[in-house]
Amino acid sequence: MEESGVIEVTVKTLDSQSRTFTVRGEWTVKQFKEHIAASVEISVDKQRLIYQGKVLQDERTLTEYNVDGKVIHLVERPPPQSSQPGGGGGGVSGSSGAADGGSSSSQSSAYTTSHDRNANNYVMLGTFNLPVNIMDPQQIQMSVQQMLAGVGEMGRNVRVSTSTGSSGSVDVHINVDQSVQSEPRMRLHLAENLLRETQALIHRLEGQSSEPSQQETPPPQPSSSSFSAHPMDSSPPPPSVSSSASQTEGETQSGPNHPSPLELVEVLSEVRRVEERLRPFMERTHSILGAATSADYNNNTQEREEDQRTLNLIGESLHLLGNTLVALSDLRCNLSAQPPRHLHVVRPMSHYTSPVMMQSGLPHIPIPMNLGSTVTMTSNSRQTSDGQPQPPHSSNQSDQQGQAPPTPANESNQQTGHGQGTPRVIRITHQTMEPVVMMQMNLDGTTVPLHVPGLPPEFMQAIMHQISQQAVTMATAASAGHQGQQQGTAGAGAQNGESPVPPPPQARVVITRPTLSPRVPQPMGTRGTTINLRAAVPPPSGQQTNQMVSGLVGQLLLPLHTGDQTSTTSSSHSFSFSTSSSTSSSSSFSSASPPLSSANTSGQTSTHTTSTASVGQAQESGPGDNLAQLLGSLLGGAAGAGGGVSGATPSITVTVPGVPAFIQGLSEFIQSGQPVFPSPNQQPPPSQATPPSAPSGPAPTTAPSGGAETLSPELFTGIVQGVLSTMMGSLGAGQGNTESIAQFIQRLSQTSNLFTPGAGDAVGFFGDLLSLVCQSFSMVDMVLLLHGNPQPLSRIQPQLTAFFTEHYLQGREPTDANIASASEDLINELEEYIAESFSTVTVREGVDIIQTNMSFLRQQFTRMATHILRCTDNTFGQRLLYLCTQGLFECLALNLYCLRGEQRALTTVINHRIRRMSAEVNPSLVNWLTSMMSMRLHVILEHNPVTEDQIQHYVIYTQSESARRTEAGSQSSQQSQNMNVEEGLSPAPATTAEEALRSTGDTDGDEAPGRPSAEETRGAVAMATTEREESTGEAEPWAATVPPEWVPIIRRDMLTQRKMKAQPPLSDAYMHGMPAKRRKTAQGEGPHLSLTEAVSRAARTAGVRPVTAPDSLQGELETPELQEAYAQQVKSDIKKRLSDDPDYNHQRFPNTHRVFSEDA
């Protein structure tokens, strides 16, 4: 064919650029790669050509693949595994550096060794699924590869593969190798970065052209808090950021490339030069501070601002310079070693980072967070000792520039020791701990995508500002009461090391931020993360605060939820997140950072590998998709549950999906000490989950802390408001955090009537109530409610009271009769919707699920309405929150019982209701809601504190089942039968609310032990609205498959069939003529002697209601005298019937006279 001819091939790279090459057809793929290497700026050994889903082999010719006139896709790949140290290092530092435009995290030693994908240096990040109709699997793979290629060295050291799953989704697998890094070199890199930032500050001090607007808050962070390794430049880091990193062509070893002592000398010389430049400004600072106490600027605003700017910049400079010295202080040179000697670290440090170079001049560019970075926070109430050096491979764990240690000697994960009078140190740093990948999907489409930006610079800055201020407050407030309370906790987890260095005599906060990868594609969407929380045994109460702040920072930046684990053994869990426990008292969280490392941390006594599956994605397809993705990032889209390991005495928190992600780290903080808002007569639960879980461990060991760690809800509110306000701003909201949920959803869904009262598919009262709640609550309010804070409910008490008075009572007085009547009318209107909701599932035999739900809803809503209309004290919000959460738990448990314990059936019912009421909502959002609800519901049901026994009194049985149960109870004696009735085992088929309240009155005294407290019910409120919404909506799956005119007919027939009464019990005459075997199975249907049932039937038949309270009537019907009189009346009536009925034959019923004889 064209074997010797010329062919034309188009090569399309991941940056969407196409290049056409005219080459000879007999060329091999290897020759073609060499030909295009200069144009595409990718070395031959890193080119991967893909055509029709197949990778072109180097030894085959282009003609064999028939690529003439076709398009070949080119992606980058890591060098072959057989690459040698010299060649590999040269390749990386050469062409790859040019391709990436220079990365601040590029290390020339990254590929000095070959990587065994089956060894410990290989970590499986996890997988995620995408709908198959989004794009071609090959295109997805290329997009992922493109994203990874832009995040530095680590991005080029990955394998991306895709496969189509059986469920119709595209499985994207990302595999990342770990690279070897020198810890001493990271110290030098860190010192260089800090010195460069210090010089930038000095340059601003020396120059007079700086904008005055920057004097109070420099772009990277506020001056009111201490940050180790934070950005000060507004320009991207230069490619030569690692100036001391020597090339590895001459290396003979396959391990880390350790720096020589001469490199340390250069850095120390630079430190001296920086100090000299800083000296005149130090003198100026001395003079300013000397007169600061009583200085009067006489309205000289310019002079005052200039002095303030000098103080701020000098403070930041000293902080950077101090951290530089700390970073260099652990570098040593062993002169007794054989030359050539190199530097080593005497105290290994697991927390590294380098400055973030913020694009403050380009506010639309989000901050590219590092992959694999970890936020770690440690609290010390006394002197600490360093951890032991890690096993040899643990030196590979920190694959980034370095980090500014917050304290001179205890930068490892500390094990607290004894000491008195030492302050509290809160440290928030970023650590390369877990490899995490954030995903960016660029989808082609004709619709204009809804712009959901990533993390702009001001977002990160505001978060750090908010957290630092709150952390300082917490550290200062709790330092006094925290002294000496954690004695003797070293135990099995104590670490041996250097003598501790006394910290300064006041609480301080050190916050660091990760490095920038300049070529991360923009904009970035949601980011995945892994949370690692480690605690000593028993965990100090100060740990609660640490986890709160750490989790808050982490979850805000990269939404996923935490696995909290407290145990005495070192273990690891991996399920869309990573949980590890150790003997160190720190909590860490993984955010994004290009480098990669092993899962071991300094201070741990055993090794383990943890993997993450926290892969986020940004889909720019349409408003609905972006909204679904955005809500997923806010509410926590990934699943996971972390439990405790046996042998641990602290509380074991079960972490579940579906919680707004960033608040998971706050759960421990809220639980510390006593409950923030304990319910009356409720004891703190043994454990708590969000959403709630059953008690799964012993009581928490937070008693020694007393009230020292119990922080006020105002602090919690302040943190959430500050951070959420910033988040809403980054999502395009206006200034402040006053945007309601309705406004938020309407803005993102581009609709105007989604929550308009009376509009859309809502149903009357409940639709208006939902609109009121969504228009009154903000995102901050929902966070507070999820954690048991009733303040938002208390705030809208006037609106709720007015709404219920107008729409519920129609202006009538809030008497018991009026409230019960309104509840009856309101719930009766829901019968059709309840019937439709359960039309497609199988109900437990003998249970009338429609009447059961209606009776339950009447009782619950009557209680809530009574409380809303009558409560006037400060317990309004607390009690209402409890009623809502308790009602939700009982509703789930009740319906799960009625559905034979099948969670799938209950999930189907709820999702069916969501889809029906979301007919006008974007289908992508609906799909997301249903999948999220399924995930949440599964875990909530697994840990529902309400048991089947506690909801039995709500169950209403069909007529035949009720009769069977009554007869079974009456076989022994009338007393036992009455007892069964009192226990609520067999209410009538259509028991009214008044009758059902009988069981409630009997069990009120016994209900308290089974009720979850406000702590247990946190998180369930989020589903309460969804449960209420079950009563709304019109669409059904089958309705779309039949002609429209048949829909009302079929629906009416369905309701008619459900309302048909069961066949009454067979008569004695009929039973006598049946075969013996069949007669035996049908026996047990005795007479109905229940007075309650008789009165209920009579009232329903006559259409009347009691004039007194239901409880009063119930009590009167259950008096022994009345029951006995009723039994005698029934007996008398039967005797009269037997004597007057001409068809009665005593020979056919020989035993009747024993009960109904004249003398009986």
From Swiss-Prot:
One GO BP: negative regulation of proteolysis
Gene assigned in the entry: Bag6
Biological role: ATP-independent molecular chaperone preventing the aggregation of misfolded and hydrophobic patches-containing proteins. Functions as part of a cytosolic protein quality control complex, the bag6/bat3 complex, which maintains these client proteins in a soluble state and participates in their proper delivery to the endoplasmic reticulum or alternatively can promote their sorting to the proteasome where they undergo degradation. The bag6/bat3 complex is involved in the post-translational delivery of tail-anchored/type II transmembrane proteins to the endoplasmic reticulum membrane.
Name of the molecule in the record: Large proline-rich protein BAG6
Segments for region (Disordered): 76-114, 206-261, 367-422, 478-547, 563-628, 672-711, 962-1038, 1126-1160
InterPro entries: BAG6 (IPR021925), Bag6_BAGS (IPR048926), Ubiquitin-like_dom (IPR000626), Ubiquitin-like_domsf (IPR029071)
Domain Ubiquitin-like: 7-82
Subunit note: Component of the bag6/bat3 complex.
Composition-biased stretches (Polar residues): 247-257, 371-417
Subcellular localization: Cytoplasm, Cytosol; Nucleus; Secreted, Extracellular exosome
